[in-house]
Design a protein with these regions (language model features):
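Gly/Ala-rich beta-loop-alpha elbow adjacent to hydrolase catalytic centers
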Residues: 238, 258-262, 266, 271
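Sec-dependent bacterial lipoprotein signal peptides
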Residues: 1-17
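Lipolytic serine-hydrolase domain surface
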Residues: 45-168, 173-174, 194-253, 270-286, ...
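The conserved beta1-alpha1 loop
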Residues: 181-185, 259, 291
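Short substrate-entry loop that stabilizes the transition state in hydrolases
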Residues: 188-193
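Alpha/beta-hydrolase fold active-site loops
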Residues: 178
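Bacterial signal peptide processing site
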Residues: 19-23
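Short, low-complexity, disordered segments immediately C-terminal to signal peptides
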Residues: 24-37
Length: 407
């Protein structure tokens, strides 16, 4: 245990600028993600993402929305777009919502709702523009320049599923109703998960209903071991939420994106669900494991066989330069599935992609959402394009795919 605690401290030092942190813009100057010359057009245009109109809110008997980061009545604007994102969480709500959000870091019962995120028209692909700070003082967010959480509204389970089904129907139509569920990783807060889901959906032009599940991470780089316990404890509720979305959303295709430590609860939940209700997991069109912090041996022995039986198109994004996964090795004494330093893991039914060359930003643990090359590839998976038809991928000597970045 002493070795693990020392390694966890090393992990904290390695993650000071990673793991779900949004990008500050230093008072209006956003960090610009370098565009990648496109080898093919993106899978869908940005206008496909649903915008919110204040005159037509989702009907609910839940408490009124809590406005944060901006005026109480957001409306259509030439300076920003509004994106509706749905959520499930087992975070305990705060008695008095404050600057840190409506939900804290303690576990609670499963609850549901929707958030409205503003995306500035000056948004750079892959970046979550947020205010900077100087000498400990945070600057107020400006929706013309920053992502802001405009509304958060609690919904009942029935209201959530009705709203998700309606949005998927409007965006895709019969036979093309899509739902995308994001499960965040270590050291990520509720608001950051909402921003990442909105940003990813906006950047890939997702036509459907985007959702996220937020488990009660401690939101502290020193709490790696404690976060591992939290994600394990959250597995039953993650399974319940995924099951409810798969069935209740009436989506024709469900795409699940899990990142980092969040992959532990996600794949364990799906493995159980595949045994209990195989008809549900049959509706999952794609499972994306981004930098998964799961021991590779455990995945091989316990998870991969069940995923094969599910016949779900699974994609692994891995790297040899992910600092967090390198530190995870020191904590756990075993290579993570997303760590390619001992070779990339390959399994039947899973497309393994070495994303080390996605750029130096991949050293940041949340780069799966920040790299334009990775976003383009994720968008192609959502669109159903197989690896052989994605020209930025090539076969490596070990048979795995390599994500190339044209500079």
């Amino acid at each position: 245990m002493d070795r693990k605690r020392i390694a966890a401290a090393l992990l904290a030092a390695a993650l000071l600028a990673s793991c779900g942190r949004t990008a500050p813009d230093d008072r209006g100057q956003p960090e610009v993600a370098q565009p990648v010359p496109e080898a093919a057009p993106p899978p869908a245009p940005r206008p496909a993402v649903e915008r919110i109109v204040r005159s037509a809110p989702v009907a609910t008997s839940a408490p009124p929305p809590v406005a944060r980061d901006g005026p109480a009545a957001p409306s259509s604007s030439a300076n920003y777009a509004l994106v509706r994102v749905f959520y499930g969480t087992n975070r305990s709500p705060l008695s008095v919502p404050g600057p840190e959000g409506r939900f804290g870091t303690l576990p609670g019962p499963l609850s549901y709702g929707e958030v409205v995120v503003s995306v500035p028209k000056v948004h750079q692909l892959g970046v979550i523009e947020r205010p900077g700070m100087i000498t400990g003082l945070f600057f107020s967010p400006d929706p013309r320049k920053h992502f802001t959480l405009r509304e958060i509204r609690g919904l009942s389970r029935a209201q959530l599923l009705q709203a998700v089904a309606a949005q998927a129907e409007r965006a895709g139509g019969p036979g093309q109703r899509l739902a995308l569920v994001f499960v965040h990783g270590f050291n990520v807060g509720f608001d950051d998960a909402a921003f990442r889901t909105a940003q990813m959906s906006y950047d890939i032009g997702f036509k459907g209903a985007p959702l996220f599940y937020s488990w009660p991470s401690h939101q502290n780089v020193l709490s790696y071991l404690a976060d591992g316990q939290r994600i394990d404890q959250s597995r039953p509720l993650i399974k319940r939420f995924l099951s409810e979305v798969i069935v209740g959303s009436r989506a024709d295709r469900v795409i699940i994106v899990a990142h980092s430590m969040g992959t532990r609860g996600t794949v364990a939940a799906l493995a159980e669900l595949s045994q209990e209700h195989p008809e549900q997991t049959a509706r999952i069109a794609a499972l994306i494991l981004a930098a998964p912090d799961i021991q590779a041996r455990n995945f091989r022995d316990r998870i991969a066989p069940r995923l094969r039986r599910m016949a779900v198109a699974t994609t692994l994004y891995a790297s040899s330069e992910d600092v967090a996964l390198q530190a995870s090795y020191q904590v756990n004494g075993a290579y993570a599935l997303g760590d390619t330093r001992a070779g990339i893991s390959r399994f039947e039914g899973m497309d393994s992609i070495d994303a080390t060359r996605a750029g130096t930003s991949f050293l940041g643990h949340s780069a799966y959402g920040e790299s334009p090359a990775l976003l383009r590839d994720i968008g192609s998976i959502v669109a159903g394009t197989p690896p052989a038809r994605r020209p930025w991928l090539r076969r490596g000597a070990d048979g795995a795919w390599v994500l190339e970045v044209v500079r």
